[in-house]
């Protein structure tokens, strides 16, 4: 809800004095369970809409709410969390992957328009993460298979993704914007 987001931004600004970094990391009602995933023929537009609303509408509302402050400060950092599945849909999570792919376009447009104000915008796209609430149903065999197909011979951890987020939020990354950086152990090298 846009009003709730505006209140959240206002509360955070009052508490911290200003906001420097926004991380868009919404996941609405989704589990990475290939056995429960609907096939495309069984999906409804409402299934898509739920993921589009959580991912894109959520990022839109948060980003639009904080932009006036970022423009006034002449700085700000927007980091959105994506997925490597848009490059290699090993499991066709249609609605989730489509929403996250849209997040890349959203982010690149924000970067192009707002860079003139010192604002950076990037996406960090993780692979299968070991282990999160969303990947809790993933079998050990799948984790092993992914590990064996990556050059690093490991499954990405939440800490691996967090490390990239911390880098992009730092002053060392002020020259990085409009990028989708994939953190998946090299699984989707391109």
Give short role names for the model-derived ranges.
Residues 5, 33-40, 44-49, 134-135, ...:
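Substrate-binding pocket helix/loop in short-chain dehydrogenase/reductase
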Residues 17, 115, 120, 176-178:
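Short, small/polar-rich loop/turn modules that mediate ligand/substrate recognition or access, typified
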Residues 20, 41-60, 75, 79, ...:
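Catalytic Tyr-X3-Lys loop
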Residues 38, 89-97, 109:
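Active-site loop-to-helix junction immediately N-terminal to the catalytic Tyr of the SDR YXXXK motif
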Residues 63, 99, 107:
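Active-site helix of classical SDR
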Residues 68, 112-113, 174:
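Alpha-helical segment proximal to the catalytic Tyr-Lys
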Residues 88, 148, 166, 177-190:
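Short C-terminal tail/terminal secondary-structure segment
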Residues 150-161, 172:
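A conserved structural motif in NAD(P)-dependent oxidoreductases
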